Regions:
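A short acidic, often aromatic-flanked loop/helix-cap motif at beta-alpha or helix-coil junctions
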Residues: 55-60, 144-147
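Conserved nucleotide-sensing/catalytic segment adjacent to the nucleotide-binding pocket
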Residues: 58-98
């Protein structure tokens, strides 16, 4: 049931509550416990996750638990146009997604141009997804800190 907030003259219900949208984003470094925390908080099993390291190109658009979006980006997204299509499709087709992605922009900047482009695309995609997500959780040492 959506929470109804009211003022003196009007009632307000957020659009995400009306449409049943509830996207959550978990970000953090490699091996920090993002998947385990997401499963616990959302009553999911690890076996339910779409593992992006070896998933099909279309799998993430129907999966409720997307693990390793950075792997998907490395495998399938190579341009700004593909980035925009990915973001648009995820927003339109997967309104209940739990998205888990490693932070790949920290550390030494790679010499290889493709690696730099991959890191930039991943960062830009995650920035856009976080803007419209209902929750964004940063995970460090298995502990989630809500940043949105």
């Amino acid at each position: 049931m959506p929470e109804i907030r009211h003022s003196l003259y009007r009632f307000e219900i957020s659009q995400s509550e009306i449409m049943g949208v509830s996207v959550k984003v978990y970000i953090g470094g490699a091996n920090q416990g993002k998947l385990d925390l997401a499963c616990i908080e959302n009553h999911k099993r690890v076996e339910e996750a779409c593992i992006c390291e070896n998933c099909g190109r279309e799998d993430i658009f129907s999966a409720k638990l997307i693990y390793g979006l950075h792997h998907y980006i490395r495998r399938f997204v190579f341009s700004e146009e593909e980035k925009d299509i990915l973001i648009e499709r995820l927003r339109a087709e997967n309104t209940q997604a739990i998205i888990i992605c490693d932070e790949v922009g920290c550390g030494v900047v790679p010499i290889d141009k493709r690696e730099r482009e991959y890191r930039e695309l991943t960062g830009r995609i995650m920035t856009e997804l976080a803007k419209t997500a209902d929750e964004v959780i940063r995970v460090f040492c298995g502990i989630g800190g809500r940043i949105k």
